[in-house]
């Protein structure tokens, strides 16, 4: 097995959960109610937290990648919709990398080559999922 080493660092992370909760005995589940929150809302809140944790601003980012199992829609891609919310007016590229459950790992691997090759210095990867809208919307 070949070992490949990358020279990159995860500077920060952020999370966001839906406001609506459902409790089953001793477990709490979070779900998005249609019309109240969106996948883009959750992504924007997670990005805000990640940038704060890293001590960065959106203007420090060279590329925005959405790495989710299910995107909001095919065209424009989810990353473009997130870009519109968190990076409006900035000219950084935005792209989706979707490999279902492994999207984040695939995105991290892919952007590591772009960073190593000098194309980008700081890439923001965000994964946002809203399974509750498709699994039991009522």
Where are these regions (language model features)?
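Conserved "HGTGT" condensation-loop signature of ketosynthase/thiolase-family condensing enzymes
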Residues: 1-65, 86-87
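Conserved beta-strand-centric core segments of catalytic alpha/beta enzyme folds
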Residues: 1-24, 108-138
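A general secondary-structure junction signal
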Residues: 65-68, 127
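Conserved catalytic cysteine-centered active-site region
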Residues: 34-37, 68-122
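A short linear-motif detector with a strong N-terminal bias
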Residues: 43-44, 75, 103-104, 130-134
């Amino acid at each position: 097995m070949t070992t490949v080493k990358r020279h990159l660092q995860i500077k920060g992370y952020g999370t966001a959960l839906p406001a609506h909760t459902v409790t089953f005995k001793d477990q709490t589940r979070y779900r998005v109610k249609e019309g109240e929150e969106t996948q883009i809302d959750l992504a924007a809140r997670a990005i805000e937290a990640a940038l704060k944790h890293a001590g960065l601003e959106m203007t420090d980012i060279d590329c925005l990648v959405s790495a989710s199992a299910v995107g909001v829609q095919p065209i424009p891609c989810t990353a473009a919709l997130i870009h519109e919310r968190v990076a409006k007016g900035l000219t950084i590229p935005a792209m989706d990398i979707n490999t279902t459950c492994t999207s984040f790992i695939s995105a991290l691997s892919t952007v590591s080559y772009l960073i190593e090759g000098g194309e980008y210095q700081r890439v923001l990867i965000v994964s946002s999922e809203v399974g509750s809208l498709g699994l039991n919307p009522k």
